[in-house]
Amino acid sequence: MKIAVIGAMEEEVTILRSKLEQTNREVIANCEFTSGFYEGKEVVLLKSGIGKVNAAMSTTILLDRFKPDVVINTGSAGGFHHSLNVGDIVISTEVRHHDVDVTAFDYEYGQVPNLPAAYKADNALIQAAEDEASELGHIQVVKGTIATGDSFMSDPDRVAFIRGKFEDLYAVEMEAAAVAQVSYQFNTPFVVIRALSDIAGKESEISFDQFLEQAAKHSTDLVLRMIKRIN
């Protein structure tokens, strides 16, 4: 079993990288791939860069060259659901684009033509995350829809617009739908694990700077537990 873990930023991958043994580092198209082992499991860690194009390009390289059996996308996100607070973790049930609009041709809002409107996370990976979440103690862990777009959600008007498009949205960020779309095309199971660094629209940029490290630690803690469980 080879497990791929993808984070966009250095803060989102640094803890996991430090835990890997027998590592080998490669840089391909300015994307950093670190292969190694954690608790006897083979892991490929990708630092993808920020945004959907970087995520799609690097995930394609990852799946084509390294051929992992499963993909876990980790890192930070902005909270959308009223029940969430900074530091909470969202496990994806499905992932959607929030900045794609081809509704003029009868596609759903967020749907790329000829592809699913929503990319469903793998049930076994969701279950592994849920099983390990109970060991995290005081951290609230929920599961739900995560949406992706190439914008940081600090504008209240934009937040209200996106809320109007998706009934039950838990978190937003800038890479997961690209990772999910490429994983779907390669028929590779995936799940997204994101901890909240901010609440969308509420001084998000200030909160992000303050709480990115905490969010990265929370999401990495769960991912490390998952790696030990996945067979």
UniProtKB/Swiss-Prot annotation:
UniProt xrefs under SUPFAM superfamilies: Purine and uridine phosphorylases (SSF53167)
Protein residues bound to substrate: 78, 153, 174-175
E.C. numbers: 3.2.2.9
GO cellular component terms, semicolon-separated: cytosol
The UniProt record lists the keyword Secreted: no
Keyword Cytoplasm on entry: no
EC class: hydrolase
Keywords, sorted A to Z: Amino-acid biosynthesis, Hydrolase, Methionine biosynthesis
GO biological-process terms attached to the record: L-methionine salvage from methylthioadenosine; L-methionine salvage from S-adenosylmethionine; nucleoside catabolic process
A molecular function GO annotation: methylthioadenosine nucleosidase activity
Catalytic activity: S-adenosyl-L-homocysteine + H2O = S-(5-deoxy-D-ribos-5-yl)-L-homocysteine + adenine; S-methyl-5'-thioadenosine + H2O = 5-(methylsulfanyl)-D-ribose + adenine; 5'-deoxyadenosine + H2O = 5-deoxy-D-ribose + adenine
The protein's role, per its UniProt record: Catalyzes the irreversible cleavage of the glycosidic bond in both 5'-methylthioadenosine (MTA) and S-adenosylhomocysteine (SAH/AdoHcy) to adenine and the corresponding thioribose, 5'-methylthioribose and S-ribosylhomocysteine, respectively. Also cleaves 5'-deoxyadenosine, a toxic by-product of radical S-adenosylmethionine (SAM) enzymes, into 5-deoxyribose and adenine.
Family: Belongs to the PNP/UDP phosphorylase family. MtnN subfamily.
HAMAP family: Salvage_MtnN
Protein known as: 5'-methylthioadenosine/S-adenosylhomocysteine nucleosidase
Organism per entry: Bacillus licheniformis (strain ATCC 14580 / DSM 13 / JCM 2505 / CCUG 7422 / NBRC 12200 / NCIMB 9375 / NCTC 10341 / NRRL NRS-1264 / Gibson 46)
Gene encoding the protein: mtnN
